[in-house]
Amino acid sequence: MQEAEIVTDIVFKIDGHVQKSFYSEEEYEELGCPLLIKWKKLRPICYEIIKGKRTPVKFRFVLKLAEEELQEMTDGLELGFTRQDIGGLYLNIVFENGKLNCITGTSLNIFTMDKTLERVWDKRVAIELEGTEKDENINKV
């Protein structure tokens, strides 16, 4: 998770960057030397903040696809750029004014007109949100 903001009677802001100095060298290596905290670790904390009798005023979660999953997703894709040109794939989940929006984002370190990666990412997110099995043809967009 890149970041989170939850607004109830107060504002909670979470920076998802792992603080390496919190861990011993061994612990950090056991975790796989992550730059960002996993959503599954923050999910129960966010749930505790959100749950209650009142709906939050708003919340926003910015999730970044893990590097391993990004590699798996881009394997076999014919892109006009390299894996190193990809800054990240993001899912922004925003609840505000009683509406929930899920917005995908793609960060590239170069300019390109090739929208293949964006289409594949949009399709993957749609499949995940629908709760269906992963389509074997997801990379064939």
How would you name each of these model-derived features?
Residues 100-141:
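Mixed-charge, glycine-accented linear interaction segment located at domain edges/termini
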Residues 1-40:
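Charge-rich, low-complexity N-terminal segments
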